Structure formats: C-alpha cells, structure tokens
C-alpha cells in the first residue's frame, strides 16, 4: 500500500484534489472545463465520459461529475465529484441557494427544471458573473 505524505495533500477550497478521477473522453470533441459529464463505459482501467444532458435517461443517469479542465477529444483528463464553479451566469435564479438542474444542452446547467429533473447543485450568487456549487453525488433525480 502506498504512503501518502501530509505535505502532499492540498487543501480543498473550490474542489478537493484527492477526489479527482482520471478519465478518457469518449467523444472526438473537446470537453470544456466545468462541463457536466456522465460515465458512458470504460477502457482498460479508465472510465469513459461524455457530456451529460437532460434530454434522455441514457445521458443523465448514474453519478454525474464535472470536468476540472479541458479534456481533449479521445484524450485523458480529470473530473471531479464536486466543485465550486465561479464566473458563470447564474442570473436566471431567483435567489442564492436556489437549486440548479442539468440542462437539455449538453454539459450545461439551468435554473429552470427541464422535463427530466436532474439536480446538479445550487446557486451561490444570482449574478451575471456568479457562482454555483456542483454536487453530482448519489441519485440526482429531483422529485
């Protein structure tokens, strides 16, 4: 078993370094940073991911994660189970703390619940240059 030294553990301010998962982009298109993804399969020891959307059960089921950085098409990158996402437009929410849902637009979130309501986090601020906390853990289906 490996030995993890305390000095190598970084504090988690907007995400936790220790929870990052190395994945393979299953598509030939780049997945941009802060886009929401779902696990679509595996290749060797790596999970394969695609952009998630609320248009079909197939593209929004299971644990959702968020891209830490741009992941090149057919390349490798890191996804996170939670992250504080800043510099995004959250002006569509009524107030800070409002729930956010997976959008029918691949990889995005929306303040208006679509037909398939998949909860992905909540707004921290309601502004054109706002922030939200992504948390794709467990069953994301809103009731």
Which role fits each region the language model picked out?
Residues 2-143:
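Glycine-anchored, exposed beta-strand/edge motif detector
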